Amino acid sequence: MTTTINTPHKLIKNGIEIGDWVIHTSKNPILKSTEKEEWEKELVLNGLPEMVYGNNFIRLSNEKRDITIVFNCMDALKMLDKVADQSIKVSSSKKWEEINKGFEGQIEKSFEWTFSSPYTGTILTRGHCYSNFEKPIGLFENTTEKIDIEKLKRPDPILFFDDVLLYEDELADNGSSMLSVKIRVNNESVFLLSRFFLRVDDVICRCLDTRIYHEFGKDYLLKEVTFKESSFDIIKPYSENDPTLLTDSNFIVSKLPIKSLTTEKILLSYNDNK
């Protein structure tokens, strides 16, 4: 028999207060061309995605434990390589031809046109900002514990849900590159999924999923990072009966082989004895 936990909560504008957490999302129009130019200068990048939702984010804050977890566009773009991924050079790609038209130097100086970011979120605590590989002692802990998928499948009432797009590019009609974040809150837990998805037609498919799961009352959050990648050949046969599957990111991701999977705890006790 399943016991239902009723965590005190209150809906707020674009978010929810639940337990010790305040969860907030922001969804706004794409950056204007002048704003994109400013971002390119700040990020020292020669190109940005066609659609940059620079003012979008998802934020989970626990003031009592002095920790905030954020997923935003700027931090994701900061992690882009400064040059193109040479492993995805496509001689017939219009995108590849366009970004190098008239360029007389080394091809490596062109921008990373797939916008493949290894971003897995930002953590703010003790006045510091940490992302990806920055892991202060005591904040993270390796674990074999897995996110309970069966609990996520239960038809529990959803108190709050949002789906936030951070950036998107159609690669000059040669595929798709997109970073989005979804969040779902019920009485017992919060679940977040950040997904970077890349499809370069006839070349490659790639996915980086970051899942964060927290059961209210527990002293930690689980963070699971999964990287998948394959040549386009593994997907193409499925399109023979249904061509629309080639543009269905969820379907494609379900067919990609896992290249790496890491799970760790984000410890809320990190600030207890500061």
From Swiss-Prot:
Superkingdom in the source lineage: Eukaryota
One family name in Pfam for this protein: TIP41
Gene Ontology terms describing biological process: TOR signaling
InterPro entries membership: Phosphatase_reg/MetRdx, TIP41-like
Molecular function terms, GO-annotated: protein phosphatase activator activity
GO cellular component terms, semicolon-separated: cytosol
Similarity remark: Belongs to the TIP41 family.
Name of the protein in its database record: TIP41-like protein
Origin species: Dictyostelium discoideum
